């Protein structure tokens, strides 16, 4: 090549983006890949040692990712002399630009390049093949490499795409993980796909079907994490937790996953690199994917995952607070009376204890709706939402019923979670205090931050996290009761002494 074709395609893409209003682009789920991100993605492939390769770019847009991978082959892989490129793109407005860009690449490239642009729906057009119906094609095309930045928007539960891929869907799916599933299906055995996508799929029950499919038929080999949510997409003011993953289509589990990280897509020359055992990155029955960025974080996972019992196995469960206050304003009260119960908010959680009342507006509510009240018994409260800049994600407070003997019932606002027993018995004070030490520790706070990059504490995820045995929890609790020290430093020290000594 006389010069970088990716520069040419990226420049023309920038002009196209700036000519369109953002709401139009967002409605199509199009967030165009930056040039540096595309080049980094292309570098991740282990290029097959053969003369002819088949490449798929689903949701090709203007062809930035296609340009990046072709440029990589043209410059650094002389053993490859022929490329068969297939692009899917349904946006009629950008199809002419895609065709022009690919034609330019074909004229400039050293390699022989055959191009097929399909303007059909990537998911619907292959639904029979994916599901293995009687209408499936007997000769399904498979690819050596797939490179993708899929569209990003939610589909309705009854959308045809969702109905056609029930194996990976749960509820109203996001189109991006249908694209990723179909791309894995399109790969030849031992083929590789490199995708940029939100990191939300790595945890949460909503994505369990997708994770099960992806991690059964494919295996993660590389993950790249962006520390900043900015500067990933070109000329787009997009704020979302984003990652790049490389998946090989194989049933063989690799020993390690290479995890890299950078501040943004403009500094790939300054990345951190870590090789983490596969069973540390992909762990548990839910197959959560833990995105560690340091040896310290890898050790955190090993220490916590050494336990085998999540809370439900001990008869405990974290639940979400019962009352959405702004939707039930007619039930809220400022004063206590015979038919009112205390309504606990996150503001009542102070330094590990529950302080009530604090003179806050609407601290009480009517008890007329049974579904919004709960028995006054011992609980551990955990904030459901924290600010991004806050030092801790897990923020807990011990609620002891004997401190509020005047109430038979209480209520919890929807922005806090609480840990309770499954059989509606009462936790002992020692058990509640032991749970506090565990969840208030630095170890478990780091663990949850690795598991979930968001600021929300998800009860389903918390119920899957392994914790110490009940007898150890009660020993920890007795230590806390004796000391009266609710600090994180004390929790860290006692957890180490009692559980890890």
Predicted regions and their residues:
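Conserved SAM-binding strand-loop segment of SAM-dependent methyltransferases
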Residues: 112-122
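Hydrophobic pocket-lining residues within nucleotide cofactor-binding pockets
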Residues: 90, 122-124, 349
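Signature of N6-adenine DNA methyltransferases within the class I
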Residues: 26-27, 31-40, 60-67, 80-82, ...
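Polybasic, glycine- and aromatic-enriched phosphate-binding surface used to engage nucleic acids
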Residues: 298-485, 489-499
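Class I S-adenosyl-L-methionine
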Residues: 1-81, 86-104, 126, 150, ...
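Short, conserved catalytic or adaptor-binding loops enriched in Gly and charged residues
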Residues: 78, 105-111, 213-217
